[in-house]
Amino acid sequence: YYPGSEKLNPDEMRVVACGTGMPQPRLKQAGSCYLVELGNGDKFIFDMGKGSTERLAALGIPTDQLNKVLVSHLHFDHAGDFPSFWLARGVNAARQPLFLWGPGGGQNPDWGIKGWSEKIKQAWAWDVATRESSGDPRSTQLTVTEIDWKGVNQLFYDENGVKIYSIPTIHIDQSIGYILEWNGLKFAYSGDTAPNKWFLEHAAGADLAIHEVMLPPDMWLDKYSMSHTAAVMSGTQGHTTPRAFGKIMEIVEPRMAVVNHAQIDFDTAPVIEQEVRKNFQGPLSLAVDFMVWNIHKDSLTTRMTIGNPEAYPPPAQVPAMAPVASDDDYSWDPFSFSGLEPRTSAVTNEVVKEFNEKHGTNITPVVSNIPFQKK
């Protein structure tokens, strides 16, 4: 699949894996992230683990169309790239606000998606302040909605024919999974979880059922040099083994079962599939980054996406809004300008002058010209 080369049919769903890996960083697989595109024009991003922003950018989709993010839980391999995605919107021609959904606080209310997002704003306040005075103010606007993490089959989104439900998961308190239904199609995303009854019931019959899997305990001994106890705890508790995944899918009976959250390599993939097949014989995908599924009511295809590693931001979809001046606007300290040097600044100003002559503009350099302006 070459992004931008195929228009979705009005009744079609396309799902692109923009991150399929584990907490351990690796170039091959980013943290969990799935883009769901619908034939009605809606797009939803489920999780945004570390490294996923670059995968999304490689699809060449206008930034304003990627304005709905749903997070399953706040571990960094599922939410770690959200700050980068949010901050990059201004330099990627965003002209619309961003919407974020995620679980509310469990034992500590501040640990919910709202408290988390406020801390992100605080941590990156300098970045936002130094950019938004010259950018579209809508690009950093963020609307956050908390979801009750104990809600079972809880409808929290119902717009444009799309319904999205949350289900609890058994991972850490304050973790959820998602079920999206549209046009007779069903997408199920488990987030991180041990096998649980809620997914079995509410993901049943899904067209695409994405569920986490961890490597078998023996592989944790080999790949991560863990103790026997740590290998068992990491590979089986609060997560799902490949064999248990097979049992889950035997019960759920999806049109396509998708293994997520596992390192898919030449030596791990055969073991994972062998374990899954002990209980499940249906259609199966071992997800890797850029795998894509096109889903119709009467067909389902699995391919690989050829992303653009040299992508530039697509053009903005709506006109820019002028920056809004306020007393909180960032202003330069005059000390910074004392470091400018006439000979090198003159070269910069020469470039600006040539640009003005070429394009018929009259743009005044705001930095390189300041110390040398005539009084």
Which residues does each PLM region occupy?
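A short local loop/turn or secondary-structure capping micro-motif enriched for an aromatic residue
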Residues: S52-R55, D173-Q174, P195-W198, M219, ...
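A general structural signal for short secondary-structure boundary/capping elements
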Residues: E118, V232-G238, T305-P309, Y330-G339
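Binuclear metal-dependent hydrolase catalytic cores
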Residues: Y1-F187, P270-L300, Q317-A320, P342-K375
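A polyampholytic, Gly/Pro-enriched intrinsically disordered region
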Residues: T302-A316
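Cap/insert and terminal regions of metallo-dependent hydrolase folds
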Residues: G184-K186, A194-M291
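Short, intrinsically disordered/low-complexity patches at protein termini
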Residues: V69, E212-V213, K223-Y224, P309-E310, ...
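Extended, charge-rich low-complexity interaction segments
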Residues: P314-V347
